[in-house]
Regions:
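Hydrophobic ligand-binding cavity/cleft-lining segments
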Residues: 1-44, 160
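Soluble or luminal CAZymes and related metallo-dependent hydrolases
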Residues: 57, 92, 133, 137
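Generic structural detector for well-ordered beta-strands
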Residues: 7-11, 53-55, 64, 99
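Hydrophobic-ligand binding "helix-grip"
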Residues: 29-32, 42, 58-108, 114, ...
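A conserved amphipathic terminal alpha-helix motif
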Residues: 108, 115-160
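Hydrophobic beta-strand positions in extracellular immunoglobulin-like domains
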Residues: 10, 113-115
């Protein structure tokens, strides 16, 4: 089982950071990536029970939100991964989760994801390749969110 762990600190309060990152369609709707909500969550559109499809780099991930505790934590699991032709990939996702914790006036975000590729002999190698790519993608997403949120915080505090 391969685990990704990416960390960043965003100069904004936890609720604001949580709201931005748990807004799946906006947070995951970036250049080279498309996300749409297939099913709304139980108590919150983006909350527990929500199902999203994320298309990126020739793959489509169907993910379900399995835990939702604003503004501290949410979890998801990839239920299915297919290529652009609809062929299922051999990919087992244990879970992914994001934790949001106050860090002074900012928020620390920890993003974890655990998965395996059950292919004899090559699986361990493919896990590392995919894991490094995914970690880079997670970092980029968090950096974009950081830039947007810190820009809002700065522009929101500017007096005329």
């Amino acid at each position: 089982m391969y685990e990704i762990h990416v960390v960043t600190t965003i100069a904004a309060p936890p609720q604001k950071v949580f709201d931005a990152i748990s807004d799946h369609e906006h947070f995951l709707g970036r250049p080279g990536m498309i996300c749409h909500l297939v099913k709304e969550g139980v108590q919150n559109k983006n909350g527990r029970g929500a199902v999203r499809e994320v298309a990126t780099q020739g793959r489509i991930f169907t993910e379900e939100i399995t835990a939702f505790d604003p503004p501290r934590h949410f979890e998801y699991v990839v239920r299915r991964m297919v290529d652009r032709h609809g062929k299922s990939a051999r990919f087992l996702h244990d879970r992914g989760w994001l934790d949001f914790a106050p860090s002074g006036p900012a928020t620390r975000v920890d993003w974890h994801s655990r998965f395996e590729i059950p292919i004899p002999i090559l699986g361990w190698f493919l896990e590392r390749v995919l894991g490094k790519r995914a970690a880079t993608g997670f970092r980029q997403l968090l950096e974009q969110a950081k830039s947007e949120l810190e820009g809002q915080t700065t522009s929101g505090n500017t007096e005329p």
